[in-house]
Amino acid sequence: MASGVTVNDEVIKVFNDMKVRKSSTPEEIKKRKKAVLFCLSDDKKQIIVEEAKQILVGDIGDTVEDPYTAFVKLLPLNDCRYALYDATYETKESKKEDLVFIFWAPESAPLKSKMIYASSKDAIKKKFTGIKHEWQVNGLDDIKDRSTLGEKLGGNVVVSLEGKPL
């Protein structure tokens, strides 16, 4: 069921900036987004970038010790969100980076919010071409343990996420 919600151009720009890893100067790399949240506009007609709900690569090691833990703390406990998380992980063979699309729909969110976010998910997913990993999360217990994301990324072959062993 489509909700009629549209995706703001800024959301698409953020996705494209996160997806394309072109050679960049150290300053440009620091400005790259590691994680970003998207929400519905106040009139519930557009999916927009949620201001101040992001982690930049340059924040890691400076104001952000562990990007995964910091990302989990950005999620509102009583409302839905969409998120992109640029996961850096290691398998037994190699280091990898993949974008993960997350649909955050906590049990404590209002039913109306869960319904409109669920029915609008396809609109944003269609704009995020090439996403390999999608994850619907319904509460902190599902997301706070990094090993759950490790399983989503590669089953039992992932040995570390963001430099931390699983």
Curated annotation (Swiss-Prot):
Modified residues (Phosphoserine): S24
Post-translational modification: The phosphorylation of Ser-24 may prevent recognition of the nuclear localization signal.
Record-level GO BP terms: actin filament fragmentation; actin filament severing
Renumbered ranges of motif Nuclear localization signal: 30-34
Expressed in which tissues: Widely distributed in various tissues.
Record-annotated ADF-H domain positions: 4-153
Cell compartments where the protein resides: Nucleus matrix; Cytoplasm, Cytoskeleton
Pfam families: Cofilin_ADF
Keywords recorded for this protein, A-Z: Actin-binding, Cytoplasm, Cytoskeleton, Nucleus, Phosphoprotein
GO cellular component: actin cytoskeleton; cytoplasm; nuclear matrix; nucleus
GO MF annotations in UniProt: actin filament binding
InterPro entries attached to this UniProt entry: ADF-H, ADF-H/Gelsolin-like_dom_sf, ADF/Cofilin
General function of this protein: Controls reversibly actin polymerization and depolymerization in a pH-sensitive manner. It has the ability to bind G- and F-actin in a 1:1 ratio of cofilin to actin. It is the major component of intranuclear and cytoplasmic actin rods.
Family: Belongs to the actin-binding proteins ADF family.
Alphabetical list of PANTHER family matching this protein: COFILIN-RELATED
Protein name stated in the entry: Cofilin-2
Species the sequence originates in: Gallus gallus (Chicken)
Gene responsible for this protein: CFL2
